[in-house]
């Protein structure tokens, strides 16, 4: 059996700066869609999926300012909701599984959220129906374009309504998406 021998007596000094985590920062980045105020986020990891999502947010009309390494400011005061239905969004959104996280904030603030069938990492079973079933419990109508593999939800004219929610499976991403959809009700 392998083992380590640790000889004490030497004090440790210094700082440890942990890198931001991809899955958490994708959720945080999408939350900027909930407000028109400027939001500053630090410790954003320089990872392909994170950079793709920042680019998608910019395509939506979010003003993105890079303040320094891992330090960005976002202002979502001129969102182009019609971007949801364009080919650019369908292509870019399909290449990033985390793009499902734009649905909740867009639904909450603009009354509609859509996503192409997402790609991204093929690790395990990660259902989308959990997200959409709960959006419907908040009063949203589910929309699916079969030929385009395009999913969406639209809020009723009188807006979303709070509801008691119990997910049929554990889902960190689903929970974050649902909280963002419900936060403005």
What are these model-derived regions, one by one?
Residues 1-185:
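Structural preference for solvent-exposed beta-strand-turn elements
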């Amino acid at each position: 059996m392998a083992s380590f021998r640790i000889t004490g007596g030497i004090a440790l000094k210094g700082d440890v700066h942990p890198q931001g985590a991809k899955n958490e920062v994708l959720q945080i980045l999408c939350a900027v869609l909930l407000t028109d105020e400027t939001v500053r986020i630090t410790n954003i990891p320089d990872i392909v999926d994170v950079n793709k999502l920042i680019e998608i947010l910019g395509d939506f009309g979010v003003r993105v300012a890079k303040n320094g390494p891992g330090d960005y400011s976002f202002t979502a005061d001129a969102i182009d909701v019609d971007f949801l239905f364009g080919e650019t969004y369908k292509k870019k959104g399909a290449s990033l599984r985390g793009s499902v996280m734009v649905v909740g904030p867009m639904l909450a603030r603009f009354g509609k959220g859509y996503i192409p069938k997402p790609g991204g990492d093929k690790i395990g079973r990660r259902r989308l129906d959990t997200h959409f079933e709960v959006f419907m419990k908040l009063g949203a109508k589910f929309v699916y374009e079969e030929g385009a593999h395009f999913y969406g939800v639209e809020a009723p004219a009188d807006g979303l309504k709070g509801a008691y929610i119990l997910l049929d499976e554990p889902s960190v991403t689903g929970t974050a998406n649902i909280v963002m959809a419900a936060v403005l009700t």
